[in-house]
A protein has these predicted regions:
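Active-site environment of non-heme Fe oxygenases that use a 2-His-1-carboxylate facial triad
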Residues: 4-220
């Protein structure tokens, strides 16, 4: 959901876990093809709105995320990236950013389902964590969430369909010490399976790409 991101990502296995810890990968071109045509069209038209609430003591602070404690620097960054921002009580910050759910790869021209729905949607939390966060903060104040670009909620049924497609299309392998994995970050999505025992996978990213900024009809 940032206005720039790496096109290349590398993984190096320093120490594989005793059990689990795979890095499942999914072809984002295949995800695009497997999506229901009506749902794909809906995402293309509506896009996505990522909402972040930076609250002291909960998840990441805005100071750590933006690497500054200067509010003016944060505000300038948000304006340049077309991110709506709102300073809240107790030194909190709320941001909203509209991004595509579906993109065209800048080099291959292929259409890809490229987004961070799984990372941000509240339905992807485990049920106990979701219930606890909603009871404490309410949906509006969750640390992170994602909606359709018009602000309407993305249905849990839609997220369940997307998760099922990810599971169907995913490929995983057991890490071995010394393994190197290089991915095109737009063509291939990745995740991480739970694991037992010590595990160390180091990651490097490069070839930063700045996407076209989507102008929002908001003030901030």
């Amino acid at each position: 959901h940032l206005h720039q991101y790496p096109l290349k990502i590398w993984f190096f296995c320093v120490q594989p876990s005793l059990q689990g810890g795979e890095t499942p990968i999914v072809d984002c071109r295949q995800m695009y093809q497997l999506l229901d045509a009506k749902l794909r069209e809906k995402f293309e038209q509506k896009q996505l709105m990522y909402v972040r609430n930076y609250t002291e003591g909960l998840d990441v602070s805005w100071q750590d995320f933006f690497h500054t404690s200067d509010k003016a620097v944060v505000e300038n960054y948000c304006r340049e990236a077309s991110i709506h921002f709102e300073w809240r009580k107790n030194n909190g910050l709320r941001t909203c950013k509209i991004c595509p759910a579906i993109s065209q790869h800048p080099k291959t021209g292929e259409m890809v389902f490229f987004n961070q729905l799984q990372l941000h949607h509240v339905s992807c939390l485990d049920p106990a964590t979701r219930k606890s966060l909603l009871s404490m903060f309410g949906e509006e104040n969750l640390p992170r969430n994602v909606y359709y670009g018009d602000g309407s909620p993305i249905e849990d049924s839609v997220m369940a369909e997307i998760q099922a497609i990810y599971r169907e299309a995913s490929i995983s392998f057991p890490w071995q010490q010394g393994d190197v994995l290089m991915l095109d970050n737009m063509l291939v999505a990745h995740s991480r399976n739970p694991y037992i025992g010590a595990r160390k996978i180091v990651v490097a990213m490069g070839e930063m790409f700045q996407k076209e900024i989507v102008t929002q009809d908001m003030e901030g």
